[in-house]
Swiss-Prot record:
<keyword id="KW-0547">Nucleotide-binding</keyword>
<feature type="binding site">
    <location>
        <position position="51"/>
    </location>
    <ligand>
        <name>ATP</name>
    </ligand>
</feature>
<dbReference type="InterPro" id="IPR001844">
    <property type="entry name" value="Cpn60/GroEL"/>
</dbReference>
<dbReference type="GO" id="GO:0140662">
    <property type="term" value="F:ATP-dependent protein folding chaperone"/>
</dbReference>
<feature type="binding site">
    <location>
        <begin position="479"/>
        <end position="481"/>
    </location>
    <ligand>
        <name>ATP</name>
    </ligand>
</feature>
<dbReference type="GO" id="GO:0051082">
    <property type="term" value="F:unfolded protein binding"/>
</dbReference>
<comment type="subunit">
    <text>Forms a cylinder of 14 subunits composed of two heptameric rings stacked back-to-back. Interacts with the co-chaperonin GroES.</text>
</comment>
<dbReference type="InterPro" id="IPR002423">
    <property type="entry name" value="Cpn60/GroEL/TCP-1"/>
</dbReference>
<feature type="binding site">
    <location>
        <position position="415"/>
    </location>
    <ligand>
        <name>ATP</name>
    </ligand>
</feature>
<dbReference type="InterPro" id="IPR027409">
    <property type="entry name" value="GroEL-like_apical_dom_sf"/>
</dbReference>
<comment type="similarity">
    <text>Belongs to the chaperonin (HSP60) family.</text>
</comment>
<feature type="binding site">
    <location>
        <begin position="87"/>
        <end position="91"/>
    </location>
    <ligand>
        <name>ATP</name>
    </ligand>
</feature>
<dbReference type="GO" id="GO:0016853">
    <property type="term" value="F:isomerase activity"/>
</dbReference>
<dbReference type="GO" id="GO:0042026">
    <property type="term" value="P:protein refolding"/>
</dbReference>
<keyword id="KW-0143">Chaperone</keyword>
<keyword id="KW-0963">Cytoplasm</keyword>
<comment type="function">
    <text>Together with its co-chaperonin GroES, plays an essential role in assisting protein folding. The GroEL-GroES system forms a nano-cage that allows encapsulation of the non-native substrate proteins and provides a physical environment optimized to promote and accelerate protein folding.</text>
</comment>
Length: 540
């Protein structure tokens, strides 16, 4: 077993605090509209230039093992905040550093760390309630664009494209971010349900120019097994032909005689038809077939529902205004499903999302919700160089998460003002003893930290800015982008309540752990000279 190096009390805490400060000082330069860039070396290729706090945090590993513990603890604050709220990582890091630094002064003065933590937790609980009071809901295109712009380091173009995407696919729709092929940002929207399976045979194509099969006012047959015998399909084919409507067949596979007959019918123009494989595998395939069934008003023909293909009727088929089938994907637009059943299905999948343990499962379930509830929008990020593309994509991603958070829980005045205003709720708050009161005062002081850093990064004197903001009330604050004071909500300087709340919660949680740490254990450094010494038996 490797020998361990153990440090106790002040020796343990001081090394951890050094690590906290190194990481926080590197991250906090990115805070605010006038935040500075951080250049990160890469083993291969050009360095990365970023203003994204969590990207900076993830890169930091310190040589000293004990200091590195502190850095990794604060890195957890940034990562957890990013996971829950998608933004606010830099604010969380700044708050954590402020609480740790203030707390360490009191611990050094001989106060009880556990009582300090109780006071901190009590104060944070009150501040969170105050933030909910300050919060207001958002819904308009302009408000959504403002939140997106702020989170993308004051980039109005990014805010606008995110607001456009949300308007197109709804607040539940999937919005993905990809590399663009031009210099400008572009928005592509896929309406309806899209899944990644294309036509089984290219002979189903009815638009040679676009290499696709388009079926208008189509009937849709869903089957969870392979179809190889044409006799099983005949009743449905005859019914579709009599109804004079095109037919989309979604099955595990269509092969042999059945496929040949469908191809001949399509080529001769007897029946407009296209066949595609069902999306997904195993249980996920069954669930997705059921999603399509609910969206289109169909019944899945399967043993589980007691339905047989040769006994299927027109009542078992779904329908959609338009179906587009390409080589690799199929889009069902404007399905005829019952709205109440679609809503119930979405709610059911949301419950599964809350219970999902793996990120992969959660992501796939969210995609299913989006396909049922709205659609899919793709933001293609344009840039001149690859370095700029990476930096811009990080900002778009942050802005997207922040905007979703704002729609979910509302907004508060930005620029660190909401936290400053929330301090009013702590004025009369008392703990059970003097040490807990000190814990409350630690939070009171730490709530200034984000505004101090924003002002400092903008080249202004933090104490002067804070004094000026405290003279006003409500939404009155400091707009670092313009250097002016005024109503921040009017000026579009807002933060999602969820982001501010999560940042404070995580910062206080981790800072409390640092303050109550009394011992640290790390691998002892290896004695390289002893390892390099030659063996005397070898006769050197």
């Amino acid at each position: 077993m490797t020998a361990k190096d153990v440090k106790f009390r002040d020796g343990a805490r001081s090394q951890i605090v050094k690590g906290v400060n190194v990481l926080a000082d590197a991250v906090k330069v990115t805070l605010g509209p006038k935040g500075r860039n951080v250049v990160i070396e890469r083993s291969f290729g050009a360095p990365v230039i970023t203003k994204d706090g969590v990207s900076v945090a993830k890169e930091i590993e310190l040589k000293d093992r004990f200091e590195n513990m502190g850095a990794q603890i604060v890195k957890q604050v940034a990562s957890k905040t990013a996971d829950v709220a998608g933004d606010g990582t830099t604010t969380a890091t700044v708050l954590a550093q402020a609480i740790v630094q203030e707390g360490m002064k009191h611990v050094a003065a001989g106060m009880n760390p556990m009582d300090l933590k109780r006071g901190i937790d009590k104060a944070v609980g009150v501040v969170l309630e105050e933030l909910r009071t300050l919060s207001r809901p958002i819904s308009t295109h302009k408000e959504i664009a403002q939140v997106g712009a702020i989170s993308a380091n004051a980039d109005d173009a990014i805010g606008k494209i995110i607001a456009d995407a949300m308007e197109k696919v709804g607040k539940e729709g999937v919005i993905t971010v990809e590399d663009g092929k031009s210099l400008d940002n572009e928005l592509d929207v896929v309406e309806g349900m899209q899944f990644d399976r294309g036509y089984i045979s290219p002979y189903f194509i009815n638009d040679p120019e676009k290499q696709a099969a388009y079926l208008d006012d189509a009937l849709i047959l869903l089957h969870d097994k392979k179809i190889s015998n044409i006799r099983d399909l005949l009743p449905i084919l005859e019914a579709a032909s009599k109804a004079g409507k095109p037919l989309l067949i979604v099955a595990e596979d269509v092969e042999a005689e059945a496929l040949a007959t469908l191809v001949v019918n399509a080529m001769r123009g007897i029946l407009k038809v296209a066949a595609v494989k069902a999306p997904g595998f195993g249980d996920r395939r069954k669930a997705m077939l059921e999603d399509i069934a609910i969206l289109t008003g169909a019944t899945v023909i399967s043993e589980e529902t007691g339905k047989q293909l040769d006994k299927a009727t027109l009542d078992d088929l779904g329908s959609a205004k338009r179906v587009e089938v390409r080589k690799d994907d199929t889009i069902i637009i404007d399905g005829a499903g019952d709205a109440a059943r679609i809503d119930a299905r979405v709610k059911s999948i949301r419950v599964q999302i809350d219970e999902a343990t793996s990120d992969y499962d959660r992501e796939k379930l969210q995609e299913r919700v989006a396909k049922l509830a709205g659609g899919v929008a793709v933001i293609k990020v344009g840039a001149v160089t690859e370095v700029e593309m990476k930096e811009k994509k990080d900002r778009v991603d942050d802005a997207l998460h922040a905007t979703r958070a704002a729609v979910e829980e509302g907004i508060v005045p930005g620029g660190g003002v909401a936290l400053l205003r929330a301090r009013a709720a702590l004025t009369d708050l008392k703990g059970a003893n003097g040490d807990q009161d000190a814990g409350i005062r630690i939070v009171l002081r730490a709530l200034e930290a984000p505004l101090r850093v924003i002002a400092s990064n903008a080249g202004d004197e933090p104490s002067v800015v804070i004094a000026k903001v405290l003279e006003g009330s409500g939404n009155f604050g400091y707009n670092a982008a313009t250097g002016e004071y005024g109503d921040l909500v009017e000026a579009g300087v807002v933060d999602p309540t969820k982001v501010t709340r999560t940042a404070l919660q995580n910062a206080a949680s981790i800072a409390g752990l640092v303050l109550t740490t009394d011992a640290t254990v790390a691998d002892a450094p290896k004695d390289e000279r002893a390892e390099a010494a030659p063996s005397p038996e070898l006769g050197y």
